[in-house]
């Protein structure tokens, strides 16, 4: 389980990215890099880090499922992820 402050910070960053997305795209298209540098640092989508939706774990994140490998494995074994089953060959 990640620290509550880190999860809150990630949510705040996501909110900032959405808030400034159109303004950032317009400045980028215009080539106004000075204007871009005056925007808040956390409004850049590059600074976002994917986190597990269940417990906020930042490492071993699987984009397709939106969770870490640990939670993915646990839920897959329980059969709670549709279309996922144990491989055998």
From Swiss-Prot:
Any one GO BP annotation for this protein: translation
Highest rank taxon of the organism: Bacteria
InterPro entries tied to this protein: Ribosomal_uS14, Ribosomal_uS14_bac/plastid, Ribosomal_uS14_sf
This protein's GO CC annotations: cytoplasm; small ribosomal subunit
Any one GO molecular function term: rRNA binding
Disulfide bonds: none
Purpose of the protein: Binds 16S rRNA, required for the assembly of 30S particles and may also be responsible for determining the conformation of the 16S rRNA at the A site.
Quaternary structure (record): Part of the 30S ribosomal subunit. Contacts proteins S3 and S10.
HAMAP family assigned: Ribosomal_uS14_1
Protein name, as recorded: Small ribosomal subunit protein uS14
Organism, scientific name: Lacticaseibacillus casei (strain BL23) (Lactobacillus casei)
């Amino acid at each position: 389980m990640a620290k509550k402050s880190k999860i809150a910070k990630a949510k705040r960053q996501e909110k900032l990215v959405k808030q400034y997305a159109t303004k950032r795209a317009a400045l980028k298209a215009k080539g106004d890099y000075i204007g871009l540098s005056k925007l808040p640092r956390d409004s850049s989508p590059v600074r976002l880090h994917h986190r597990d939706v269940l417990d906020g774990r930042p490492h071993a994140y699987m984009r397709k499922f939106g969770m870490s490998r640990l939670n993915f494995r646990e839920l897959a074994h329980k059969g709670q992820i549709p279309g996922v089953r144990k491989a055998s060959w």
